[in-house]
C-alpha cells in the first residue's frame, strides 16, 4: 500500500489518479458539507462544475425532492436553497432529498478524479472512518487536497495528515511519498488544529465572512462515522 498526496485541484492528472483509491478533501467546507448531509439522511449528492449546469439539472426534479447547495467565493449562490455551510444541512432539511451542489474548489476536485478506482469523500469530521475504510481496501491511495483557487491549502493538508496518521497507528508498513510523510509530520506537530489552521488564508476569508461557527464545526475530529463515495455520477453512503 502506497499513499501519495496532491496539493490542489490544479495538480490532478489522469495518470496520478487512474486505478487508485482517491480521497478528496475540501475541509473548508465542501467535503464537510457532503459528509454531514449524507450522515443526516440525504439520499444522494450530485456535484457540478458550474452554477448554470446545476440550475439546468434542477429542472429535471420536482421542487420537493431536490435542494440546491453551494457557494462562489464562500458566499451562497443567488437562487440556491443552501450555502456551503455544513450547519445548514440538518436532518430535517436534507433527509431523503437529492442535493445538487457546486462549489469553488471541492466539486472541481471531484470531477477531475473520475478515473480513480474509488473516490472517497473525507474531512476532519470523518477522518478516522475514512482511514479505517482505506485500510480495508488495501490499495494504493492518492489523497487529493482541493486547495483554494488552485493553490495549496494548509487546512486540507493537515486533514490528509490526520488520515495518514490514523492509518499508521494500525499499519506501520505503509509506503509514503515525501509529501505524504510531510503531511503526517504536520499533523503530528499540530494536533491542536485551530492553532494551525488560523494561519491559513482560507481561514481568514471565512473569519471575514463571520463563518466562525462553520470553522469550529469543520475542525472537529471524527465526530461522524460515515464515509461518502462518489461513483462519477452521484455521492452516496458507502
UniProtKB/Swiss-Prot annotation:
Key words of the record: Hydrolase, Magnesium
Transit peptide among keywords: no
Cofactor: Mg(2+)
Gene3D superfamilies: ComB-like
Family annotation (InterPro entries): ComB-like, ComB-like_sf
MF terms (GO), sorted A to Z: 2-phosphosulfolactate phosphatase activity; magnesium ion binding; sulfopyruvate decarboxylase activity
EC number of this enzyme: 3.1.3.71
Superkingdom of origin: Bacteria
The keyword Magnesium appears for this protein: yes
Pfam families cross-referenced by the UniProt entry: 2-ph_phosp
Catalytic activity of the protein: (2R)-O-phospho-3-sulfolactate + H2O = (2R)-3-sulfolactate + phosphate
Stored PANTHER family: 2-PHOSPHOSULFOLACTATE PHOSPHATASE-RELATED
Homology family: Belongs to the ComB family.
HAMAP family (UniProt xref): ComB
Designated name of the protein: Probable 2-phosphosulfolactate phosphatase
Organism: Clostridium botulinum (strain Eklund 17B / Type B)
Amino acid at each position: 500500500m502506497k499513499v501519495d498526496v496532491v496539493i490542489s485541484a490544479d495538480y490532478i492528472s489522469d495518470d496520478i489518479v487512474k486505478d487508485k483509491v482517491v480521497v478528496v478533501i475540501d475541509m473548508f467546507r465542501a467535503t464537510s458539507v457532503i459528509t454531514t448531509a449524507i450522515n443526516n439522511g440525504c439520499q444522494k449528492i450530485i456535484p457540478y462544475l458550474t452554477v448554470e449546469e446545476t440550475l439546468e439539472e434542477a429542472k429535471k426534479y420536482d421542487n420537493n425532492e431536490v435542494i440546491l447547495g453551494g457557494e462562489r467565493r464562500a458566499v451562497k449562490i443567488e437562487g440556491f436553497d443552501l450555502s456551503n455551510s455544513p450547519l445548514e444541512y440538518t436532518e430535517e432539511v436534507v433527509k431523503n432529498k437529492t442535493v445538487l451542489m457546486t462549489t469553488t474548489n471541492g466539486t472541481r476536485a471531484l470531477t477531475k478524479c473520475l478515473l480513480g478506482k474509488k473516490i472517497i469523500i473525507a474531512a476532519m469530521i470523518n477522518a478516522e472512518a475514512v482511514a479505517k475504510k482505506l485500510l480495508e481496501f488495501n490499495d494504493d491511495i492518492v489523497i487529493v487536497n482541493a486547495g483554494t483557487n488552485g493553490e495549496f491549502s494548509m487546512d486540507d493538508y493537515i486533514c490528509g495528515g490526520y488520515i495518514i496518521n490514523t492509518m499508521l497507528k494500525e499499519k506501520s508498513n505503509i509506503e509514503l511519498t515525501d509529501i505524504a510523510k510531510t503531511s503526517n509530520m504536520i499533523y503530528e506537530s499540530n494536533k491542536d488544529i485551530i492553532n494551525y489552521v488560523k494561519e491559513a488564508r482560507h481561514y481568514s476569508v471565512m473569519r471575514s465572512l463571520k463563518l466562525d461557527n462553520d470553522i469550529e464545526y469543520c475542525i472537529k475530529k471524527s465526530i461522524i462515522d460515515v464515509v461518502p463515495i462518489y461513483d462519477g455520477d452521484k455521492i452516496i453512503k458507502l
